[in-house]
């Protein structure tokens, strides 16, 4: 369940803090299921500086373990999120991406600071260079945007 995933990620932060990790530099990124979790964690964990969600489902999920959806938590985002999506993703319709963009504009300050990039001709998994849907141009651009996003949201001094 989502609650367990959030608790597990929180436990990772505790562990990192106890083992020399810099908790002023907490960022998150995830792909597919992890992209969905990235959105949810950005609404859950105030220690996040920013996050990047790669083609994570935004609306209705895959059953009773996923009762909360990213579109439902935009008003609770505690960190700005960059969402990277493909126009040809059969599992995440462009209409869902547009609905999320509209919701972000009405959400928290962090939601309004969030962005979504929709890649033309890109499918779900466009970053996975070991899969047939790999799109080199979108993957390279997405990676550069991911790194820039994290640099754009530095830890507090």
Language-model region placement:
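N-terminal cap/leader regions of alpha/beta-hydrolase-fold enzymes
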Residues: 1-157
């Amino acid at each position: 369940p989502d609650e367990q995933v959030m608790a597990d990620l929180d436990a990772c932060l505790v562990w990192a803090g106890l083992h020399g990790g810099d908790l002023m530099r907490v960022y998150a990124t995830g792909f597919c299921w992890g992209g969905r979790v990235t959105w949810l964690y950005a609404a859950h964990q105030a220690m996040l500086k920013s996050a990047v969600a790669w083609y994570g489902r935004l609306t209705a999920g895959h059953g009773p373990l996923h009762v909360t959806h990213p579109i439902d938590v935009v008003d609770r985002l505690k960190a700005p999120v960059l969402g990277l999506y493909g126009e040809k993703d059969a599992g995440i319709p462009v209409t869902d991406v547009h609905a999320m963009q509209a919701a972000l504009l009405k959400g928290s300050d962090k939601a309004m600071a969030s962005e979504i990039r929709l890649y033309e001709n890109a499918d779900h998994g466009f970053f996975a260079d070991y899969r047939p849907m790999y799109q080199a141009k979108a993957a390279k651009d997405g990676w550069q945007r991911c790194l820039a996003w994290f640099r754009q949201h530095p830890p507090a001094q």
